[in-house]
């Protein structure tokens, strides 16, 4: 199969000699334009690809040099094999690269570190031993093995032990003092080095170089977490679409009280995201709270009725970025034009928790410190609830410090001890439980989740806005 591919690839090159190489930056001159669509909110895949290529280069130019210098690392080695990619993979590769190529070894070297000169993008060498240049972001090292001319294939790819020998040569040429590897007991995002790859490196490099290995946990963690202003602007558009979709879902355009089930809304969301060319990173959920009934009485898939409080947990994925949102709605009873005051007060308590979270989240603080500060302020306001926020971006549950878990409100050892950094995003996820007089003081949970941006200046803001009014199902449009 590989030989057949090589032959076909050679024929393709003969027919279209200017064709762009697979996984490299797209050539805008080639291939017909995508079919027109009135429902493609983020443009064509080709347009998204060009944008992502620009983001990739700028992210590596902007964030990686100071991170390597801050963490005292002059070389960072990231080896992986096809279908067993390191979690940092999507943060350092182009959008056309879905998996590692056979074995791919990415090497980053700070050539200015020895002289202790000011760090800049020009200081960092980016080398790919296997795979491609990712649109010119990396310098490729290929094999010297000759290839039979009859195949029409390009220069051979590195393979097997040859890759480790090539890595050893790269290291010996540069003589790094500290070599970062992705190994961690605490963070999944920084534990991408497999046992087999570590063994393979060790056998070839020997103690001379393996003695310089360091588990630099925060280097990949913070690189994955860091976002550009250009990505912030795109994320705002993603969030605006999520708001539009939740408002439509929680309306009379979709819900027929007495007929529509919660599962109907779940699959409406899945279908709507798919129809718009979007992805999602988790199965959405929709739940109901009802006066005089407990959740186990409602069942797993209740029919929505007038007077219900509705809640959704939804997200979309576009251009490798993810959203995570929870909104709430009230189904009007006949003759009602608004939700009961007690339900609005319950939402206001959740809003107060959001205020606390936004005000207490700032660079340099750990997730556990932020959690403690928020819980203290909740106690001062007599608000009952829980806080369980997480970073978001390249992953839905993203890289960085957790701010609580729903079942760990005393702090999260390890994962809550990392520090917030500038230019990262959070899903501010929480719930406030409030007795509602109109429901005979039955406790009602208002669970909310809105995405928040921490700018390069350390200031926080909502990616778009936060919900401070219940959506009303049955209200006149």
Q: What name fits each language-model region?
A:
Residues 1-4:
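Positively charged n-region of N-terminal signal peptides that target proteins for export
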Residues 6-16:
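Bacterial N-terminal signal peptides
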Residues 18-22:
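Sec/Tat signal peptide C-region and signal peptidase I cleavage site
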Residues 23-477:
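Active-site neighborhoods and metal-handling regions in enzymes and metal-associated proteins
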């Amino acid at each position: 199969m590989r030989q057949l591919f090589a032959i076909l690839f050679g024929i393709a090159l003969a027919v279209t000699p200017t064709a762009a190489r697979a996984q490299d930056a797209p050539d805008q001159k080639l291939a017909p334009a995508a079919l027109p669509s009135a429902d493609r909110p983020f443009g064509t895949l080709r347009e998204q690809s060009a944008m992502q290529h620009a983001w990739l280069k700028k992210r590596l130019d902007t964030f990686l040099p100071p991170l390597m210098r801050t963490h005292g690392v002059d070389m960072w080695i990231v080896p992986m094999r096809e279908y067993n990619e390191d979690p940092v993979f999507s943060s350092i590769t182009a959008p056309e690269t879905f998996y590692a190529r056979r074995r791919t070894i990415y090497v980053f070297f700070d050539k200015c570190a020895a002289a202790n000169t000011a760090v800049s993008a020009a200081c960092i060498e980016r080398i790919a031993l296997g795979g491609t240049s990712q649109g010119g972001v990396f310098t490729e090292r290929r094999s010297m093995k000759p290839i039979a001319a009859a195949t029409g294939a390009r220069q051979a790819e590195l393979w097997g032990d040859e890759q480790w020998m090539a890595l050893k040569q790269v290291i010996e040429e540069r003589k790094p003092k500290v070599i970062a590897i992705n190994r961690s007991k605490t963070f999944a995002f920084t534990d991408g080095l497999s046992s087999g790859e570590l063994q393979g490196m060790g056998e070839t490099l020997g103690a001379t170089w393996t003695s310089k290995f360091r588990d630099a946990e925060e280097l990949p963690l913070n690189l994955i977490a860091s976002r550009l202003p250009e990505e912030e602007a795109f994320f705002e558009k993603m969030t605006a679409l999520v708001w539009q979709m939740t408002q439509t879902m929680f309306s009379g355009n979709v819900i027929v009280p007495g007929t529509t089930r919660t599962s109907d809304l779940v699959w409406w969301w899945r279908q709507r995201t798919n129809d718009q060319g979007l992805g999602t990173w988790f199965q959405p959920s929709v739940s109901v709270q009802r006066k005089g009934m407990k959740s186990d009485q409602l069942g797993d898939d209740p029919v929505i009725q007038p007077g219900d409080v509705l809640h959704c947990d939804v997200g979309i994925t576009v251009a490798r970025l993810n959203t995570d949102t929870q909104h709430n709605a009230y189904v009007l009873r006949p003759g009602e034009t608004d939700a009961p005051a007690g339900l609005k007060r319950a939402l206001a308590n959740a809003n107060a928790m959001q205020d606390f979270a936004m005000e207490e989240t700032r660079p340099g603080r750990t997730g556990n410190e932020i959690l403690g500060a928020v819980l203290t302020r909740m106690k001062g306001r007599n608000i009952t609830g829980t806080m369980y926020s997480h970073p978001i971006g390249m992953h839905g549950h993203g890289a960085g410090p957790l701010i609580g878990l729903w079942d760990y409100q005393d702090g999260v050892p390890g994962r809550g001890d990392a520090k917030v950094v500038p230019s990262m995003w959070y899903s501010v996820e929480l719930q406030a439980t409030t007795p509602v007089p109109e429901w005979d003081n039955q406790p009602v949970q208002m669970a909310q989740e809105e995405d928040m941006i921490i700018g390069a200046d350390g200031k926080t803001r909502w990616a778009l806005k936060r919900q401070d009014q219940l959506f009303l199902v049955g209200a006149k449009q």
